[in-house]
Amino acid sequence: MGPWSRVRVAKCQMLVTCFFILLLGLSVATMVTLTYFGAHFAVIRRASLEKNPYQAVHQWAFSAGLSLVGLLTLGAVLSAAATVREAQGLMAGGFLCFSLAFCAQVQVVFWRLHSPTQVEDAMLDTYDLVYEQAMKGTSHVRRQELAAIQDVFLCCGKKSPFSRLGSTEADLCQGEEAAREDCLQGIRSFLRTHQQVASSLTSIGLALTVSALLFSSFLWFAIRCGCSLDRKGKYTLTPRACGRQPQEPSLLRCSQGGPTHCLHSEAVAIGPRGCSGSLRWLQESDAAPLPLSCHLAAHRALQGRSRGGLSGCPERGLSD
């Protein structure tokens, strides 16, 4: 595979990668929107506690998601435009965006491996605080917030061996609500599904980002070295000076000018001292064609020398 074929394949793969990165950015943006405005996360975040453990984690996740969406989208747009227009600056900008997006995703993966249950613990701690204050009856607002959480997660109460609230818990779940699952289990199952989707998007994002980094770096060097497909077979025409004639081979000029021009060249080649032994064709780069009177004068001079018998020079005719 030649260099032009490799550049062509890299361009096609770069455009396809940018398309999938745009789809990935749209998916991440949808997930971030659902995380921030979704009922399951919003009902926990809106709990009016003095210190909500989940609120700080929620804000951090939302900011990181928006930053990642912006970097992926901007990098895909810049790289696609640079691939089509073969712009070195745009390709460098796309490479920078993909590098930052790669660093952000690596940070997310490291955070997931280092603290895999941080979001889950924050949500469960928030629910525990709302549940305990509602069961103690210190505030009517806490009971409304607890009821809202249970309606959203379709759960009721919690089954914990560390609970010391007595018979008040039995009055919370009655009728159809008693058949619901434990709220702690309901929150864990919901977060498990959400985290699986987030992990899948992060893995796909890392693969696409690495591919985009490789393609963008290769195309950047290709554009810098001038390996451009769109310019293949095109030539740059430099403007010619005013009054300057184009250069032609002397043989072509003789064939176009006829025998008179050839005889003039022969006379010039022989010179005033005699014959040079062989006819030399002249490469006149900048000289303009002489008028017909000059050609006739040279022809007559050549005929006179031939008839007079120049020393050491064979007799030449027009047949040569």
Swiss-Prot record:
Query: From its record, what is one biological process in GO terms?
Result: platelet aggregation
Q: Any idea which UniProt keywords this protein has?
A: Membrane, Transmembrane, Transmembrane helix
Q: Which Pfam families match?
A: Tetraspanin
Give GO cellular component annotations, separated by semicolons.
cell surface; integrin alphaIIb-beta3 complex; plasma membrane
TM region positions: 14-34, 60-80, 90-110, 203-223
Q: In which tissues is it expressed?
A: Expressed ubiquitously at low levels. High levels of expression are confined to hematopoietic tissues including peripheral blood leukocytes, thymus and spleen.
UniProt subcellular location? Membrane
Major location, coarse class?
Answer: membrane
**Bilayer topology term:** Multi-pass membrane protein
Similarity comment text for this entry: Belongs to the tetraspanin (TM4SF) family.
Query: Under which name does UniProt file this protein?
Result: Tetraspanin-32
Source lineage: Eukaryota, Metazoa, Chordata, Craniata, Vertebrata
